[in-house]
């Protein structure tokens, strides 16, 4: 054992033989600091106790273990503490203990979800979890999904799949519709997809903050007259400000009649659809072609975590799967 496990260059990486004692020392010390921060939350409050945190650039030869942990403590003291019972201002719940362990294991394994051979167990776990969510949401056996680092990316994946499925990947007149209270991430998605601002059509809401069906029909008719082809309509299951739920069943009926992809942004409220809570009544999310679920909100899964569920996984595969000549493709799952 060394006196300073950080600066002993023999132990920069976990060893493939031996006890990994240096790693254990650092893990234990880190655990003690974070657990004390949790334990002190109620008496210290959710807001930072130190607002003078200073960022420091990496040094060529590193820092001692004591200096490093002093800076870690400063970082923690300058952080928002979601464990405090009064930290209810945003959708940032305390992390589940088991989720903290999951992050630790994922960091230690450091497997690459690019291909099955690089992450054999985790790739299968991802597929299994998405299938589980799909079944709980009422989708058929054809459904599946993919995990992503946040709701914005899940929404983006859904929109790209919808546009590709409609055969409008290169159509400059391809548009999609959202409510005026939909999440701001859709503006980002529009830009990333190479579309102009006017390719995103915002529909007015009613007095309750829900997408107005009369206004929706007006916008659809206008798009038809102007020769604009709609590749998706987005319904929100829990808007950011008011928690409003768009009329999913009525929107679904229009989408089926006009052969338009229905995507549900359930980043906030979607997680309730796997429960028996009253919010789940009369909300058939399985009517959609796709839905975004964010376990990091409300469910207590560590950031960032999001899942996109698609009613037919083959559409997602056809949209995003590519050949990887430098890795094995045998028994691959969607990554």
List the predicted regions and their residue ranges:
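Active-site-proximal loop/turn and secondary-structure-junction residues that shape catalytic pockets
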Residues: 182, 239, 268-270, 297
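Acidic/histidine-rich catalytic neighborhood
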Residues: 222, 269-290
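Active-site phosphate-binding strand-loop segment of PLP-dependent enzymes
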Residues: 211-263
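Short acidic, glycine/serine/threonine-rich loops at helix termini
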Residues: 157-160, 187-192, 243-247, 272-277, ...
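N-terminal entrance/gating region of PLP-dependent enzymes' catalytic architecture
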Residues: 2-142
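Active-site C-terminal subdomain of aminotransferase-like
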Residues: 283-335
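PLP-dependent aspartate aminotransferase-fold enzymes
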Residues: 2-9, 92-106, 110-229
């Amino acid at each position: 054992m060394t006196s300073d496990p950080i600066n002993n260059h023999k132990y920069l990486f976990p060893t493939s033989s031996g006890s990994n004692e240096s790693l254990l020392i650092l893990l234990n010390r880190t655990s003690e600091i974070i657990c004390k921060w949790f334990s002190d939350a109620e008496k210290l409050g959710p807001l930072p106790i130190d607002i003078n945190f200073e960022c420091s650039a990496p040094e060529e030869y590193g820092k001692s273990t004591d200096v490093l942990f002093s800076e870690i403590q400063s970082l923690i003291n300058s952080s928002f503490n979601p464990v405090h019972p009064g930290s209810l201002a945003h959708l940032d719940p305390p992390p589940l203990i088991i989720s903290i362990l999951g992050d630790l294991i994922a960091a230690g394994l450091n497997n690459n979800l690019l291909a099955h051979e690089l992450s054999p167990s985790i790739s299968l776990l991802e597929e299994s979890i998405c299938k589980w969510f799909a079944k709980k949401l009422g989708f058929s056996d054809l459904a599946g999904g993919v995990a992503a680092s946040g709701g914005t990316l899940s929404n983006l994946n859904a929109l790209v799949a919808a546009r590709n499925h409609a055969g409008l990947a290169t159509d400059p007149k391809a548009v999609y519709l959202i409510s005026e209270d939909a999440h701001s991430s859709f503006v980002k998605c529009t830009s990333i997809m190479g579309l102009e601002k006017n390719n995103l059509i915002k529909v007015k809401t009613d007095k309750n903050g829900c997408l107005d069906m009369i206004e929706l029909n007006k916008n659809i008719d206008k798009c038809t007259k102007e020769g604009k082809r709609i590749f998706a309509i987005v319904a929100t299951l829990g808007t950011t400000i008011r928690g409003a739920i768009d009329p999913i069943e009525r929107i679904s009926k229009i989408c089926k009649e006009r052969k338009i992809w229905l995507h549900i942004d359930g980043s906030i409220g979607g997680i309730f659809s796997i429960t028996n809570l009253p919010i789940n009544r009369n909300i058939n999310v399985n009517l959609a072609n796709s839905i975004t679920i964010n376990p990091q909100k409300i469910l207590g899964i560590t950031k960032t975590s999001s899942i996109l569920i698609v009613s037919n996984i083959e559409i997602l595969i056809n949209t995003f799967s590519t050949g990887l000549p430098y890795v094995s493709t045998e028994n691959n799952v969607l990554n």
